[in-house]
Amino acid sequence: MEFKHISVLLEETIDSLNIKEDGVYVDCTLGGGGHSKEILKKLSHKGKLIGIDQDTSAIKAAKERLKDYENVIYVHNNFYNIDSILEELDIDKVDGIIMDLGVSSYQLDEASRGFSYMKDAPLDMRMNREENFSAYNVVNSYEEEELFRIFKNYGEEKFSRKIARFIVEKRTENPIETTGELVEIIRKAIPAKFQREGHPAKRTFQAIRIEVNKELQILNKAIEDSVNRLNKDGRLSIITFHSLEDRIVKVKFKELEKPCTCPPSFPICVCGKEPQIKIITKKPIEPSKEEKEINSRSRSAKLRVCRKI
């Protein structure tokens, strides 16, 4: 299956990076190479792009899309490791970093990946298929209380308790092996009148995907490490697709902009924590009405940008 992914907030993201033609840039979520190609168009032969992705299918697709460019380094890894990746490449500082945290259209559309609640497939949801831990393990081995926790915290699911109970009851008969089986369990757990608000499995699938790929833990550390690797005036641009991610980015940016932990009553700062960034986007940038109409998957996207000081 061809790797297809429509880059969200493409123009806004590229503009936010304030690209220098001889700069060094990192695309932490290479995907099909949409954002990367626009960055490369603005670079001279002295500039450089590092493209990171944990999905080998994405890297293969990006290499094909970017085959006309020689100043690209491809890295099969998780952007959680951005610090060690740059260390291994002997790159100290960079001028801009982008993270697009959405699941690609390819991953959603390829049924065998198990990300979609619209297609029956094995329970998988691994971004990196070289990892062993998958959605199957979460659904079939987590205790009821643990399932409740992730559905509530990562999916903000109103019926987390009931869904967790129904899953545990069902798997005592036989292991739950497919997305279709899981969707049916969720449908039975959620009252019919609440199933009119979008697909009933959406929040639960989001929660399981986040748990399988440790997405929220990765994001916090990656933001800190990325800021540390930016040159002065370098930009970090992050696109999120749900409120949990957006909240993490918003809070972390605020912590890095105003890190002082001194009590308000102190006349001067004595903690010694200096601001590291300036937030560029006081409110997140959202897709235009036109983009939302063209690409429905862009509707929940938000872009936040900061500048290293």
From Swiss-Prot:
Annotated GO MF terms: rRNA (cytosine-N4-)-methyltransferase activity
Reactions accelerated catalytically: cytidine(1402) in 16S rRNA + S-adenosyl-L-methionine = N(4)-methylcytidine(1402) in 16S rRNA + S-adenosyl-L-homocysteine + H(+)
Any one biological process term the GO annotation gives: rRNA base methylation
InterPro entries associated with the record: RsmH, SAM-dep_MeTrfase_MraW_recog, SAM-dependent_MTases_sf
Alphabetical keyword list: Cytoplasm, Methyltransferase, rRNA processing, S-adenosyl-L-methionine, Transferase
Gene3D superfamilies in the record: Putative methyltransferase TM0872, insert domain (1.10.150.170), Vaccinia Virus protein VP39 (3.40.50.150)
Single GO cellular component term: cytoplasm
SUPFAM superfamilies linked to this entry: Putative methyltransferase TM0872, insert domain (SSF81799), S-adenosyl-L-methionine-dependent methyltransferases (SSF53335)
Enzyme class, first EC level, given as a word: transferase
Keyword S-adenosyl-L-methionine: yes
Binding site residues for S-adenosyl-L-methionine: G33, G34, H35, D53, F79, D100, Q107
Compartment(s) where it occurs, according to its Swiss-Prot or TrEMBL record: Cytoplasm
Superkingdom of origin organism: Bacteria
EC number from the UniProt entry: 2.1.1.199
Principal cellular location given in the protein's record: cytoplasm
Family, per entry: Belongs to the methyltransferase superfamily. RsmH family.
Protein's job: Specifically methylates the N4 position of cytidine in position 1402 (C1402) of 16S rRNA.
PANTHER family, per the entry: 12S RRNA N4-METHYLCYTIDINE METHYLTRANSFERASE, S-ADENOSYL-METHYLTRANSFERASE MRAW
Protein name: Ribosomal RNA small subunit methyltransferase H
Organism of derivation: Clostridium botulinum (strain Loch Maree / Type A3)
Phylogenetic placement of the source organism: Bacteria, Bacillati, Bacillota, Clostridia, Eubacteriales
